[in-house]
Amino acid sequence: MNTATGFIVLLVLATVIGCISADFQGGFEPYEEEDAERIFRRSPTCIPTGQPCPYNENCCSQSCTYKANENGNQVKRCD
C-alpha cells in the first residue's frame, strides 16, 4: 500500500468514526416543527406607497388602487 492509498483509507475511517460519534451525541436528530418555523420565519414587511402591489394586505397603507404607469398602462399600486 502506498502513501496516497493509506491516506485515503485513514480519511475514510476518520469520516466513519466522526459520523458514528455525531449520531451518539444527537447530531443527526431531526428538527422539531417549532425549530423549523423559527429558522425559516420571515419578519413581516409591507410594500411602501407607490410600489406595485399584488394584494391589498401587503401594502403598508392596506390600500391598493389602479394608477397609470410611465407607459400609460393601468397597474395596481399601494396608496
From Swiss-Prot:
One of its GO terms (cellular component) is extracellular region. It comes from the Eukaryota. Disulfide bonds join C46-C60, C53-C64, C59-C78. Residues 23-42 form a propeptide. Residues 1-22 form the signal peptide. One of its GO terms (biological process) is defense response. InterPro entries: Omega-atracotox (IPR009415). One of its GO terms (molecular function) is calcium channel inhibitor activity. It is found in: Secreted. The keyword Glycosyltransferase does not apply. The keyword Disulfide bond applies. Expressed by the venom gland. Keywords: Calcium channel impairing toxin, Disulfide bond, Ion channel impairing toxin, Knottin, Neurotoxin, Secreted, Signal, Toxin, Voltage-gated calcium channel impairing toxin. It holds the Pfam family Omega-toxin. The record marks P52, N69, R77 as: Critical for insecticidal activity. Belongs to the neurotoxin 08 (Shiva) family. 01 (omega toxin) subfamily. The presence of a 'disulfide through disulfide knot' structurally defines this protein as a knottin. Inhibits insect, but not mammalian, voltage-gated calcium channels (Cav). This is Omega-hexatoxin-Hi1b.
